Curated annotation (Swiss-Prot):
UniProt GO molecular function: cysteine-type deubiquitinase activity; hyaluronic acid binding; RNA binding
EC number from the UniProt entry: 3.4.19.12
Broadest EC class assigned to this enzyme: hydrolase
Biased composition (Basic residues): 510-524
Positions of the USP domain: 80-375
InterPro entries given in the database record: HABP4_PAIRBP1-bd, Papain-like_cys_pep_sf, Peptidase_C19, Peptidase_C19_UCH, USP_CS, USP_dom
Catalytic activity entry: Thiol-dependent hydrolysis of ester, thioester, amide, peptide and isopeptide bonds formed by the C-terminal Gly of ubiquitin (a 76-residue protein attached to proteins as an intracellular targeting signal)
Comp. bias regions, Polar residues: 493-505
Biased composition (Basic and acidic residues): 382-392, 398-412
GO biological process: apoptotic process; positive regulation of epithelial cell apoptotic process; protein deubiquitination involved in ubiquitin-dependent protein catabolic process; regulation of apoptotic process; regulation of protein stability
A GO CC term assigned to this protein in UniProt: nucleus
Protein name, per record: Ubiquitin carboxyl-terminal hydrolase 17-like protein 24
Length: 530
C-alpha cells in the first residue's frame, strides 16, 4: 500500500536524460516502479495515466506557460543569408532552422530575456536574441553570425550539424537557470526552452506473470529515428513504439512478484512538444559513413498514434524547416536548410544564398533533421500576421523603414534616387522577396527627362533648334531641299560661343537618347547654327 499512496499523491521519480543527442530511452533507463497494482486492480491503466498528467510536483515554475508570446512578432518575409566563415555551413544551417521556429523567434523579438539578464556576454539566450533579431530584420542582406554562437564548439573544421543544434538548444536551456542553479530536475524541465522543444517519454514494462506495471518518464528535446529498415518517418516512428518482448536472458525482474518473468516493454510519447525535432540517424556511430537513402517525410504529421493516449483525436504537426546534408560522410560534405517564412513561402537557405523554393522540392531532399510545429500553434501565429503585427513603440516602424532603405541605398548606389513610397517599402519588406522588391523599385523609379524645349530659352538668339521628323525617308523623299539646307548649315563653322552651346546640347541629347533608347516614339533633336 505504500506504493499505492505514493502513486495517488503523484510523487514520481525521474531520470534526467543528460545526453541530448541520443533521445530514445533504452535499457540504460533506471526502472522505477510507480505502482505494484495487478492488472485487475480498481485503478486501471487508463486511470493511472490520467492521474499522472502533471508527472511530478514542481517546486518552482521557471517559465510560466502564460509568459510565452501569444502572437507573432516576426516579419512576414524571409530574412538575411549567413556568411560562411570557413567550414561553418553546419552552423548556418542550424541557426536558420532555429531562427524560423515561431515560438522561439517571437520570444527573442519580444526582448523579454535581455531586459532581465545580468550576464549578457556569456548568455546564449542573449546571443541568440541578437542573431535572430538581425537575421529577421535584414531581408535581402548577408550577415555574419557572431563567433560567440559557436564558442567552445567550432574548431576550424566541419562538425555535425545536429550536435551543434542540440549544443545550442542545451546552452539556451542552461541560460534560463542563472539564478536557479539549485533547483531540482523537475523544475529545470519547466524552462522556456523545454516548453518549446520538450516533452516526456513514457517507458512502460508490464510483467506477464503478475501483470504489475512499471513506468519510467524521461524528458526529451529531440527524437532520434532509426532509418535502417524504414522507408518513411511514419515507419520509423512505428518501429520506435513497437512493443518489445523481454524473455529468456532478457527476462524482467519484477518488483511486484519478485521473480524474473517475461514482460512486455512499450515506449510512447507521454507529453507532446510544441516544436518537434526529428533526427534521422544517417551516420554510423563507428565509421561516420552516411546512410544515403531516401526517407519519405510528410508536410503534415499526425503524432497521435505514438502517444500514450492514442485515442484522443489527431495531433497534427506541420513541417516548417528541414536541415539537409549533401555528401557521403559526417566528416565532409555540405549542410544547408529549407525554411518556411511567416508568409507561407518556402526558401532554401544555403549560407549567403537565399532562394525561393517549393514544397515539392522540400519534400524530395535527403533530410537529416526535420522540424515540425503543432498545427494549432502555426495557425495561431499565421493568423496574428494576417491581422497585423503587435503595436510597437511610437515611431519605431518609420525608424526601421528608414534604416532599411538607407542600408539598401548604401549597398546599391543605383537605387539612391528616387525614394520609394511608404506603402511600397512596407510591401517590399513584409510580403516580397528581394527580387520582387527590386522589380518594384525599377517600376516606380522616375525616368530621366530631357525636353529640348526647356533648353531653348537659354540658347543665344543666333542659334536655331530644328526638330527633325522621326521618319527619315519622308524628309528624304518629299523635302530634298530641306535636307540639303541642313547639311550645308551643319557644315558651317560656328563661333566659339556657338561651339560651346552645341557641345553642351549634343551631350545632353546623347544622354537623353541613351535613357530613351527603348522609346520608339521619342523625337530626335538637331541643332543648326545660322
Amino acid at each position: 500500500m505504500e506504493d499505492d499512496s505514493l502513486y495517488l499523491r503523484g510523487e514520481w521519480q525521474f531520470n534526467h536524460f543528460s545526453k541530448l543527442t541520443s533521445s530514445r530511452p533504452d535499457a540504460a533507463f533506471a526502472e522505477i516502479q510507480r505502482t505494484s497494482l495487478p492488472e485487475k486492480s480498481p485503478l486501471s491503466c487508463e486511470t493511472r495515466v490520467d492521474l499522472c498528467d502533471d508527472l511530478a510536483p514542481v517546486a518552482r515554475q521557471l517559465a510560466p506557460r502564460e509568459k510565452l508570446p501569444l502572437s507573432s512578432r516576426r516579419p512576414a518575409a524571409v530574412g538575411a543569408g549567413l556568411q560562411n566563415m570557413g567550414n561553418t555551413c553546419y552552423v548556418n544551417a542550424s541557426l536558420q532552422c532555429l531562427t524560423y521556429t515561431p515560438p522561439l523567434a517571437n520570444y527573442m523579438l519580444s526582448r523579454e530575456h535581455s531586459q532581465t539578464c545580468h550576464r549578457h556576454k556569456g548568455c546564449m539566450l542573449c546571443t541568440m536574441q541578437a542573431h535572430i533579431t538581425r537575421a529577421l530584420h535584414n531581408p535581402g542582406h548577408v550577415i555574419q553570425p557572431s563567433q560567440a554562437l559557436a564558442a567552445g564548439f567550432h574548431r576550424g573544421k566541419q562538425e555535425d550539424a545536429h550536435e551543434f543544434l542540440m549544443f545550442t538548444v542545451d546552452a539556451m536551456k542552461k541560460a534560463c537557470l542563472p539564478g536557479h542553479k539549485q533547483v531540482d530536475h523537475h523544475s529545470k524541465d519547466t524552462t522556456l526552452i523545454h516548453q518549446i522543444f520538450g516533452g516526456y517519454w513514457r517507458s512502460q514494462i508490464k510483467c506477464l506473470h503478475c501483470h504489475g506495471i512499471s513506468d519510467t518518464f524521461d524528458p526529451y528535446l529531440d527524437i532520434a529515428l532509426d532509418i535502417q529498415a524504414a522507408q518513411s518517418v511514419q515507419q520509423a516512428l512505428e518501429q520506435l513504439v513497437k512493443p518489445e518482448e523481454l524473455n529468456g536472458e532478457n527476462a524482467y525482474h519484477c518488483g511486484v512478484c519478485l521473480q524474473r518473468a517475461p514482460a512486455s516493454k512499450t515506449l510512447t510519447l507521454h507529453t507532446s512538444a510544441k516544436v518537434l525535432i526529428l533526427v534521422l540517424k544517417r551516420f554510423s556511430d563507428v565509421t561516420g559513413n552516411k546512410i544515403a537513402k531516401n526517407v519519405q517525410y510528410p508536410e503534415c504529421l499526425d503524432m497521435q498514434p505514438y502517444m500514450s493516449q492514442p485515442n484522443t483525436g489527431p495531433l497534427v504537426y506541420v513541417l516548417y524547416a528541414v536541415l539537409v546534408h549533401a555528401g557521403w560522410s559526417c566528416h565532409n560534405g555540405h549542410y544547408f536548410s529549407y525554411v518556411k517564412a511567416q508568409e507561407g513561402q518556402w526558401y532554401k537557405m544555403d549560407d549567403a544564398e537565399v532562394t525561393a523554393s517549393s514544397i515539392t522540392s522540400v519534400l524530395s531532399q535527403q533530410a537529416y533533421v526535420l522540424f515540425y510545429i503543432q498545427k494549432s500553434e502555426w495557425e495561431r501565429h499565421s493568423e496574428s500576421v494576417s491581422r497585423g503585427r503587435e503595436p510597437r513603440a511610437l515611431g519605431a516602424e518609420d525608424t526601421d523603414r528608414r534604416a532599411t532603405q538607407g542600408e539598401l541605398k548604401r549597398d546599391h548606389p543605383c537605387l539612391q534616387a528616387p525614394e520609394l513610397d511608404e506603402h511600397l517599402v512596407e510591401r517590399a519588406t513584409q510580403e516580397s522577396t528581394l527580387d520582387h522588391w527590386k522589380f518594384l523599385q525599377e517600376q516606380n523609379k522616375t525616368k530621366p527627362e530631357f525636353n529640348v524645349r526647356k533648353v531653348e530659352g537659354t540658347l543665344p538668339p543666333d542659334v536655331l533648334v530644328i526638330h527633325q521628323s522621326k521618319y527619315k525617308c519622308g524628309m528624304k523623299n518629299h523635302h530634298p531641299e530641306q535636307q540639303s539646307s541642313l547639311l550645308n548649315l551643319s557644315s558651317s563653322t560656328p563661333t566659339h560661343q556657338e561651339s560651346m552651346n552645341t557641345g553642351t546640347l549634343a551631350s545632353l541629347r546623347g544622354r537623353a537618347r541613351r535613357s530613351k533608347g527603348k522609346n520608339k516614339h521619342s523625337k530626335r533633336a538637331l541643332l543648326v547654327c545660322q
